């Protein structure tokens, strides 16, 4: 499996009065910058077989922008991508065949923890994703360990592709 891990784009700050964390939207700047980054993603990765997203608003908005860059791709919500454990996330991903390319959009710290687990490192020895950043991992078999990092890019680089 090829797994494309994307952190949601820039959202309104946590603690904004009247907006619960799960309802924080992308900022106009976040939307604009991620539209550019998504074009770069589409150049690096052919249209995935599936695009999964956390049900939280900022992740869904990020997934919708990514889907538009690939064309004809409908994001599917997966609750485990909001706050689930690695086992819950792995169960969602195990629904896809080993030759699939799956993109997931989620939040820190789980995107970094997921990447660390896929690469077989300690969960606290992680690469931290910038908002709108992405990583591509080739996963040869089981999801825990053994993955090969193809690339790990911040949004600034994705926007320049």
Give the ranges of each region predicted by the language model.
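Residue-level signal for well-ordered alpha-helical positions
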Residues: 65, 117-118, 140
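Flexible, glycine-rich active-site loops centered on histidine and acidic residues
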Residues: 108-109, 116-127
């Amino acid at each position: 499996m090829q797994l494309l891990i994307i952190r949601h784009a820039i959202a309104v700050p946590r603690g904004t009065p009247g907006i619960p964390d799960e309802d924080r939207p992308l900022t106009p700047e976040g939307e604009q910058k991620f539209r550019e980054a998504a074009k770069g993603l589409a150049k690096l990765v052919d249209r995935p077989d599936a695009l999964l997203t956390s049900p939280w608003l900022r992740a869904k908005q990020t997934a919708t922008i990514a889907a538009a860059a690939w064309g004809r791709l409908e994001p599917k919500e997966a609750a485990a991508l909001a706050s689930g454990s690695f086992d819950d996330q792995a169960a969602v991903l195990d629904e896809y065949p080993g030759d699939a390319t799956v993109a997931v959009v989620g939040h820190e710290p789980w995107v970094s923890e997921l990447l660390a687990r896929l690469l077989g490192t300690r969960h606290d020895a992680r690469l931290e994703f910038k908002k709108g950043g992405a990583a591509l991992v080739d996963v040869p078999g089981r999801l825990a360990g053994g993955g090969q990092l193809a690339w790990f890019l911040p949004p600034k680089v994705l926007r320049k592709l």
